[in-house]
Amino acid sequence: MEELYELPEGNNCQVNQVLYNLLRRGVEWDLLPWCRSNKTAVMAYSPLEQGILLENKKLRNIAQKTGISEAQLSIAWTLRNEDVISIPKAASLEHVEQNIKAWEIILPNEILRELDEAFNPPTNKEALNIL
């Protein structure tokens, strides 16, 4: 992004699409803060890690406490900050409807702390992940 912004008109970029979910949090170390400081939105693709998160026992336990699905919890987590857009895949109308409900969910700090304990935030700079 820094190289892009150094190009003529490079600072016209409005969004950076990155792999971002509970299992892939490396962008939190430096890219997400950089995007924020440069007023560039972040678009999180694969917020469910291609469905892998839906089978995660830790996520399931936290979702059960909150009364929402694993998918809704994962999507709501990516949307906890106003400057992140989440683009989950939806294979059916039911999935679309459930995903839409995730936009209305505000996760309490206690749940966010549990998610941080279950899915550790980065402790150092990481290479950018892609699928």
Annotated model-derived regions:
Residues M1-P122, A127-L131:
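Beta/alpha (TIM)-barrel catalytic core signal, keyed to glycine-rich beta->alpha loops juxtaposed to Asp/Glu
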